[in-house]
């Protein structure tokens, strides 16, 4: 997160750019939230270039006091999950090189969801 305007807007970026994504509640403030069983956006995923970038983003998210909803190692990728100001899900992730993807004995992809060690990841931000 590069900038936050109270609880009404946040600007996200990677690589030093001022912002790639702007999130705000300017038009929706005070409006009703959709019912939990309604269709709609589940989450937006933002691909980061490498593990060091994911670590740097995690550091900034935590420094800004934004709560994480989760963190996972999917075998092919590592991801952190949070909510935007409107409550929409945001996934920030990095892909592993295809040569590192987990494979079953028959060669098929063996993705999963394991805990992501955030302390080990954060050490890469330093």
Question: What are these model-predicted stretches?
Answer:
Residues 1-26:
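Core segments of cupin and vicinal oxygen chelate
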Residues 5, 35-37, 73:
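Short glycine/proline-enriched turns and hinge-like loops at secondary-structure junctions
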Residues 7-8, 13, 28, 53, ...:
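Generic serine detector
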Residues 17-18, 39, 45-101, 109-111, ...:
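Vicinal oxygen chelate
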Residues 29-34:
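Short beta-strand/turn micro-motifs at beta-sheet edges
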């Amino acid at each position: 997160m590069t900038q936050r305007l109270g609880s009404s807007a946040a600007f996200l970026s990677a690589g030093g750019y001022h912002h790639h994504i702007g999130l705000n509640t300017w038009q929706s403030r005070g409006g009703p939230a959709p019912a939990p069983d309604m269709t709609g956006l589940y989450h937006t995923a933002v691909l980061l270039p490498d593990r060091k970038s994911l670590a740097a983003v995690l550091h900034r998210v935590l420094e800004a006091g934004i709560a994480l909803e989760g963190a996972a190692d999917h075998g092919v990728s590592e991801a952190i999950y949070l909510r935007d100001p409107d409550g929409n899900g945001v996934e920030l992730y990095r892909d592993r090189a295809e040569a590192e993807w987990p494979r079953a004995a028959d060669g098929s992809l063996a993705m999963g969801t394991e805990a992501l060690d955030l302390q080990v990841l954060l050490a890469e931000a330093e």
